């Protein structure tokens, strides 16, 4: 089910206009000199199991390239929040989003970038496993 969750998050991001998706390592941005922005990074954190469900915690990060004068800083962060919010509204109805919190950032990778990351917790019933 873990793989299915990551694949679905990737699919939803691409449907919303994300050009590049990385899984598990935000610093892959530095290893790709010809990267296409915006980028979505899906990183797993803690996974818990109960008798009936899997509980996954992820950090979803939206990254876009910053103008030299940083004039698009707030636009990038605002767009990132809106995109991540839309992504979360489109997760399957049988997945329970129990929490989400957002934080903006400014970061130098190979490019000067800005964006927002969102910690989420999803509960997925074991009955949903294909």
Regions found by a protein language model. Give the residues of each.
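Charged, amphipathic alpha-helical segments and their flanking helix caps
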Residues: 1-24, 28, 41-130
